């Protein structure tokens, strides 16, 4: 089975984290569950490293949303994120779902995935995982979670 870090992360998110946010995150039991699900130890280790990096980059204090300059993307980011992905990030920032720090965290975590390109659905999962890990982002997380399962985007209020 050809799996990626994102496949492991999605499996963890769908089967463990989204069901019980207070789940004791015993790495050994999670790893055993992932191995039983058919993931390789190497990909599991990379996924745990990805999650560790996400938790280490948590902003210490929520900052108010301010309109700042437009983000200019590096060539590697342009290669990995198509125009739909970049437009979606801009949409999220303009509608105050993400602030600039969270956008940068999403970009960092997207670039850390072992995929040459991410499509919009993959990026949405990265955004959802970042928001899930952000204190004070419960409303943004709930909105984003709703968007994952709708064909048409719900308006932001």
Curated annotation (Swiss-Prot):
Instruction: Fetch the InterPro entries from UniProt.
Output: Smg (IPR007456)
Query: Which PANTHER family does the entry mention?
Result: PROTEIN SMG
Identification of the protein by name? Protein Smg homolog
UniProt lists the family membership as follows: Belongs to the Smg family.
């Amino acid at each position: 089975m050809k799996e990626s870090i994102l496949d492991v992360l999605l499996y963890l998110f769908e089967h463990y984290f989204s069901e019980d946010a207070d789940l004791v995150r015993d790495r050994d039991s999670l790893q055993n569950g992932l191995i039983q699900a058919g993931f390789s130890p190497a990909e599991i280790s990379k996924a745990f490293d990805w999650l560790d990096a996400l938790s280490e980059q948590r902003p210490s204090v929520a900052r108010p949303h301010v309109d700042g300059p437009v983000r200019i993307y590096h060539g590697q980011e342009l290669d990995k994120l198509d125009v739909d992905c970049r437009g979606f990030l801009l949409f999220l920032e303009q509608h105050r779902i993400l602030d600039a720090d969270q956008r940068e965290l999403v970009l960092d975590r997207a670039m850390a995935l072992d995929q040459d390109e991410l499509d919009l659905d993959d990026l949405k999962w990265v955004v959802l995982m970042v928001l899930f890990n952000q204190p004070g982002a419960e409303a943004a997380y709930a909105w984003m979670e709703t968007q994952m399962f709708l064909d048409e985007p719900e308006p932001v209020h």
